[in-house]
Design a protein with these regions (language model features):
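A solvent-exposed interaction/effector surface
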Residues: 1-168
Length: 168
């Protein structure tokens, strides 16, 4: 398994993985859970795919989504990529280093909400505390994700035990 995925074993439903601090280029979105479930984020994901494809970087960053559950009727979401290229019209977000518990969500895994539920249950059973001081969730999509196929992405929850920064 690669450094980005962490060390998963057959007796665990999730793996712990380190994410270094980095700067993302992308866009903020705000909306309801219902809007997101109905595909409201798809145009933003497609926009990030185009940004990634136009990047001169040798390594293609995953498309990273960060969630802030900051109101009862919905949430804020930042979707972006790590790139050295300047991108006019996009926002930059400095993301601190973090340790995350994560799992892959793919075809046959149920809904994303069900997968997050499995991940949260696994953390509780393992006695691992979440750290929502920067963001609530982190999602990583392949840079060439096909949104017409069953959704495949890495779901990550920041956990205690690493340094945190602040949103800028």
């Amino acid at each position: 398994m690669c450094l980005m995925c962490g060390d998963a074993t057959l007796d665990h439903a999730f793996a712990l993985a380190e994410r270094p601090g980095h700067r993302l280029t992308g866009r903020f979105w705000s909306g309801t859970f219902e809007q997101a479930a109905a595909g409201a984020l798809h145009p933003l994901i497609e926009e990030m795919k185009l940004l990634s494809a136009s990047s001169s970087d040798l390594w293609k960053s995953p498309i990273v989504g960060l969630t802030w559950n900051d109101r009862p009727d919905g949430f804020r979401y930042f979707l972006g990529i790590e790139t050295e290229d300047e991108a006019a019209g996009f926002e930059r977000l400095d993301v601190p280093a973090m340790q995350c518990a994560g799992l892959w969500h793919g075809a046959g895994a149920g809904t994303v909400v069900e997968s997050y539920g499995r991940l949260m249950r696994g953390l509780r059973e393992a006695g691992i505390a979440r750290d929502q001081s920067f963001c609530g969730q982190r999602e990583e999509y392949p840079p060439d994700i096909d949104l017409t196929a069953p959704l495949a992405l890495r779901l990550l929850l920041p956990v205690r035990g690493s340094n945190r920064g602040t949103q800028s």
